[in-house]
């Protein structure tokens, strides 16, 4: 019996840096008698000996993998054959601040230009104190900000007087009033409802949970439904909610607070049903913040404010780059070179 048995064998060769020696001729100008030097080749200007590929890799490994300077120095030596000190790593991050912040500003402008914006926040640590990391995102851009306050002024400053059509957020007070209207995160409401049920409410919370789950199920099917069908579903959900909220207040404390809040914010629950571009949760924001939570737990965050600024800008570049089909390394390298990472159109 004859035939062919084919299989693949995959391996990595030893990784070694490419070192390019630059020789620049120097002399004396015969006219003015001043010393002159030959210009440096483009991309090989004097300064740091490390090229953009190393800079992007260092930032990538530190930001996305939460590798400390000490471990990163050892990893670069043992895996990549590159001797680099912790001080040099810090210098790479410091130099990256200007181009990364510039790229982040472009990303922020893209978020502000969006009709639908989502936002969330989590705590951060800077110089041993509690700060806050905010994320503001659209379908095409994700912007991170690390600041010392959780107040609504953070968002007000970010928006620069611009008001999106719809603001997607949880019920935190600092998230209120930034859009023309709000879409409340139904995932957060389901958690609040679950808590009320566990606390003993057997009337309002279970019925409200059924309405929310029905709304979520409709939201998952929106792309396959006609506009007229969605309008009918929206009217039906409003009727169910009106009937539920026209009843007596619950006697259990957490259920009563939820009941009163829903009476106040009832208009903010089902906007997504007839707006396919509006999510029914702000889970995208929570996913965008999750790597930062891991980074905080692993590294205990930042010893200096500039480190927080670089991290937020790099996180914005990486997350936005992924929306546009770029890897973290590709997005960072483009941003460091001043190349746009967002596709136009």
Across the structure, where does each feature detected by a protein language model lie?
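Catalytic center-proximal scaffold of phosphoryl-transfer enzymes
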Residues: 19-345
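Short, conserved DNA-binding cores of transcription-related domains
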Residues: 1-30
């Amino acid at each position: 019996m004859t035939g062919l048995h084919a299989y693949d064998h995959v391996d990595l060769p030893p990784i070694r840096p490419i070192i390019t020696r630059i020789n620049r001729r120097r002399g004396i100008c015969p006219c003015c008698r001043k010393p002159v030097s030959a210009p440096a080749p483009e991309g090989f200007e004097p300064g740091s000996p490390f090229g953009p590929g190393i800079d992007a890799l260092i930032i990538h490994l530190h930001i996305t993998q939460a590798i400390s300077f000490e471990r990163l120095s050892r990893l670069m030596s043992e895996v990549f054959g590159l001797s680099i000190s912790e001080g040099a790593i810090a210098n790479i991050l410091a130099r990256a601040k200007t181009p990364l912040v510039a790229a982040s500003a472009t990303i922020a402008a893209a978020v502000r230009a969006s009709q639908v914006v989502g936002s969330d926040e989590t705590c951060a640590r800077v110089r041993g104190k509690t700060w806050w990391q905010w994320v503001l995102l659209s379908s095409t851009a994700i912007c991170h900000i690390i600041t010392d306050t959780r107040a609504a002024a953070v968002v007000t400053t970010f928006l620069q007087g611009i008001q999106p059509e719809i603001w997607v957020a949880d019920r935190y007070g600092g998230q209120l009033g930034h859009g023309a209207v709000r879409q409340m995160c139904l995932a957060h409401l389901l958690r609040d409802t679950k808590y009320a049920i566990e606390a003993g409410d057997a009337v309002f919370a279970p019925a409200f949970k059924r309405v929310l789950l029905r709304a979520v199920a409709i939201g998952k099917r929106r792309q396959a439904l006609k506009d007229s069908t969605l309008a009918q579903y929206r009217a039906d959900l409003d009727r169910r909610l009106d009937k539920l909220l026209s009843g007596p207040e619950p006697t259990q404390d957490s259920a009563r607070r939820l009941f009163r809040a829903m009476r106040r914010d009832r208009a903010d629950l089902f906007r997504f049903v007839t707006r396919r571009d509006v999510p029914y949760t702000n889970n995208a924001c929570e996913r965008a913040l999750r790597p930062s939570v891991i980074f905080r737990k692993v590294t205990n965050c930042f010893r200096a404010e500039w480190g927080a600024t670089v991290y937020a800008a790099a996180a914005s570049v990486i997350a936005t780059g992924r929306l546009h089909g770029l890897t973290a390394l590709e997005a960072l390298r483009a941003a460091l070179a001043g190349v746009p990472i967002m596709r136009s159109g």
